[in-house]
Amino acid sequence: MRSKFKDEHPFEKRKAEAERIRQKYSDRIPVICEKVEKSDIATIDKKKYLVPADLTVGQFVYVIRKRIKLSPEKAIFIFVDEVLPPTAALMSSIYEEHKDEDGFLYITYSGENTFGDFETA
């Protein structure tokens, strides 16, 4: 999936920003979170997050749910490289495995399981 953030910001600028963030906040992970294009779920109000390294994927999903004001009965799926990461995984390990060459971790979310693959631990 194409990232709007990548389209709007040149690579060198993104890389420099991610490096600056990692130097200043070594215990945080720079995350870009965007909605899957054709999903009918609400669009998030901000794309950029500084996530504590010890946060789990499940806790990050909770943050996203709150930001888009998603009711408890509605489903949300988050994807890293078009795969559902394990809920108990630490964001730091997801970052190390899937960070982009610009230094950001790109996460997409949807109201439906659009890709269908689960990552096995």
UniProtKB/Swiss-Prot annotation:
Keyword Hydrolase recorded: no
GO CC annotations on file: autophagosome membrane; cytoplasmic vesicle; fungal-type vacuole membrane
Keywords carried by this UniProt record: Autophagy, Cytoplasmic vesicle, Lipoprotein, Membrane, Protein transport, Transport, Ubl conjugation pathway, Vacuole
Lipid modification (Phosphatidylethanolamine amidated glycine), residues: 116
One Pfam family cited in the UniProt record for this chain: ATG8
Taxonomy, superkingdom: Eukaryota
Compartmental location: Cytoplasmic vesicle, Autophagosome membrane; Vacuole membrane
GO molecular function: phosphatidylethanolamine binding
Propeptide regions on this chain: 117-121
BP GO annotations: autophagosome assembly; autophagosome maturation; cellular response to nitrogen starvation; mitophagy; protein transport
Membrane topology label: Lipid-anchor
Coarse class of the protein's main subcellular location: membrane
Annotated positions for site Cleavage: 116-117
PTM: The C-terminal 5 residues are removed to expose Gly-116 at the C-terminus. The C-terminal Gly is then amidated with phosphatidylethanolamine by an activating system similar to that for ubiquitin.
Family under the similarity heading: Belongs to the ATG8 family.
Task performed by this protein: Ubiquitin-like modifier involved in autophagosome formation. With cpr-1/atg4, mediates the delivery of the autophagosomes to the vacuole via the microtubule cytoskeleton. Required for selective autophagic degradation of the nucleus (nucleophagy) as well as for mitophagy which contributes to regulate mitochondrial quantity and quality by eliminating the mitochondria to a basal level to fulfill cellular energy requirements and preventing excess ROS production. Also participates in membrane fusion events that take place in the early secretory pathway.
Protein name, entry field: Autophagy-related protein 8
Organism expressing this protein natively: Neurospora crassa (strain ATCC 24698 / 74-OR23-1A / CBS 708.71 / DSM 1257 / FGSC 987)
Lineage, top ranks: Eukaryota, Fungi, Dikarya, Ascomycota, Pezizomycotina
